[in-house]
A protein has these predicted regions:
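A glycine-biased, small/acidic residue-tolerant capping/turn segment at secondary-structure junctions
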Residues: 74, 297-307, 335-342, 351-353, ...
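Short acidic/histidine-centered micro-motifs embedded in hydrophobic/aromatic stretches
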Residues: 103, 123, 140, 211-215, ...
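All-alpha helical catalytic cores of prenyl diphosphate-utilizing isoprenoid enzymes
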Residues: 51-58, 62-80, 88-99, 178-190, ...
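Divalent-cation-assisted or electrostatically stabilized phosphate/pyrophosphate-binding catalytic cores
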Residues: 144-184, 235-255, 279-282, 304-330, ...
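Conserved N-terminal diphosphate/IPP-binding helix and adjacent helical/loop segment
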Residues: 8, 12, 16-124, 129, ...
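Alpha-helical phosphate/pyrophosphate-handling elements in metalloenzyme active cores
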Residues: 75-127, 244-287, 323-328, 376-409
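Short aromatic-glycine-(Arg/Gly/Cys) micro-motifs in beta-strand/loop hairpins
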Residues: 1-6
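Helix-loop-helix
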Residues: 196, 328-334
Length: 409
């Protein structure tokens, strides 16, 4: 039994899953005067959320200020409107990567609260928003973060013209996507501008910029593989996707972009040595792989409302995941069944039920879950042996691992 204790009363929940649900319904103000007892993983999870909610408040305030500075009133109205679309997408993220930058920064126990990490965190969140804008074009997605995507927003606006010309529909989509590319590009360079204007005099500026560029390059390399693999498998006479292929996407696109990169940026800002950063990057690699496996499991079995995107999009996009590669390598007959749905748009609920059933009965879901848990456990074990991270922040990192395991979106 896990105890949730504050000044006035005590609440008991049965397990970490219940604690996670309870925390999600609370807020940072409520959590400040509360402690959790009875289970180490629960205590670690709670420590992470207390840290995360604090950083979330700071980042939301900072991103609002940054977003307001994006608007240049001397710009053409069309540019101002486009910039407002960037701002619309740049303000409602989960800020997990920003929190990892803060965690990497504070993990040296600098005994200060000077928020030096904030411009770095907001620049990274702006980069993330920008690459997701491009990702939405690549995936032909209509929803992101529970909102319509930028191309869809423009497309809806163009529809109001009631133009009936023969090529209007095709041109409308092309222009909407083109604007999405332009706005994503704008966000990339605004993120760079934030970094340069805030850290040009920092003694670690070159290290920050080099690492930031490495993260961006790795992410784009991973995206290239992620785009080509499903197309090649679906339409070209090439060998089937293997687990090694999938792991290469996970390494470049997710492990670096979502976990290794942001935490390492915070460490550079805190002036950790290159050797210490390399050790943490090796540790965080497994965590990044586990993070993506969880994402892919949620992409099939998650709740659409919580995910903020279509629950069938991974299947419609013929996305190559560890679930898919497991069946491709182990069960040709079930792969044939899976191909009835993979790459098909507008899948019905019963279609997705059949996909879920295939992944479950073949053991693909269990296989993916077991690897994910192994990655998380390995990260925890290695973390115990790291001597240069402050113990308080080790607990928060451990809590973050538990969060990744139990998250539902």
């Amino acid at each position: 039994m896990i105890k949730i204790i504050n000044d006035k009363n005590k609440i008991e929940v049965e397990d970490i899953n219940e604690l996670y649900k309870w925390i999600k319904n609370e807020n940072s103000i409520t959590l400040k005067n509360i402690k959790v007892e009875g289970n180490k993983k629960a205590e670690d999870l709670f420590a992470f959320f207390k840290f995360y909610f604090k950083i979330l408040e700071e980042c939301k305030e900072s991103i609002t200020d940054i977003n307001n500075n994006f608007i240049d009133n001397t710009d053409n109205k069309l540019v101002v409107d486009a910039t407002k679309e960037l701002i619309r997408m740049n303000k409602d993220g989960k800020f997990i990567r920003a929190a990892l930058i803060a965690l990497g920064y504070y993990s040296k126990n600098l005994n200060n609260d000077n928020k030096e990490y904030l411009p770095l965190a907001t620049a990274y969140e702006t980069f993330q928003t920008s690459i997701l804008i491009h990702d939405d074009i690549i995936d032909n997605a209509d929803l992101r973060r529970g909102k319509i995507t930028i191309p869809k927003s423009y497309s809806n606006e163009f529809e109001k013209s009631n133009n009936n010309s023969k090529d209007f529909h095709q041109r409308k989509i092309h222009i909407a996507n083109s604007l999405g590319i332009c706005i994503g590009d704008l966000g990339f360079y605004l993120a760079s501008k934030i970094l340069i204007s805030n850290y040009r005099d920092n003694p670690n500026f070159d290290r920050i910029l080099n690492l930031y560029n490495t993260i961006v390059i790795n992410t784009i390399k991973g995206e290239i593989i992620d785009v080509l693999l499903p197309f090649n498998e679906q339409y070209c006479d090439v060998p089937r996707t293997t687990e090694d292929d999938v792991m290469e996407i996970y390494r470049l696109k997710t492990a670096w972009y979502s976990i290794i990169g942001p935490f390492s940026l915070g460490m550079v800002l805190a002036n950790y040595s290159d050797e210490e950063i390399k050790k943490m990057q090796e540790l965080l690699y497994n965590l990044g792989i586990g993070f993506q496996i969880k994402d892919d499991i949620l992409g099939i079995f998650g709740d659409e409302k919580e995910l903020g995107k279509s629950a069938s999009s991974d299947v419609s996009e013929f996305k190559q995941t560890i679930l898919y590669s497991y069946i491709a390598q182990n069960n040709p007959e079930e792969l044939e069944n899976l191909h009835k749905y993979y790459g098909v748009e507008d899948l019905k609920e019963e279609d997705m039920d059949n996909v879920k059933d295939i992944f479950t009965r073949t053991g693909a879901r269990k296989y993916a879950t077991d690897i994910m848990e192994s990655m998380f456990n390995e990260t925890r074990k290695t973390l115990d042996n790291i001597k240069f991270i402050d113990e308080k922040y080790k607990q928060i990192i451990s809590g973050f691992i538990t969060y990744l395991d139990f998250r539902t979106k």
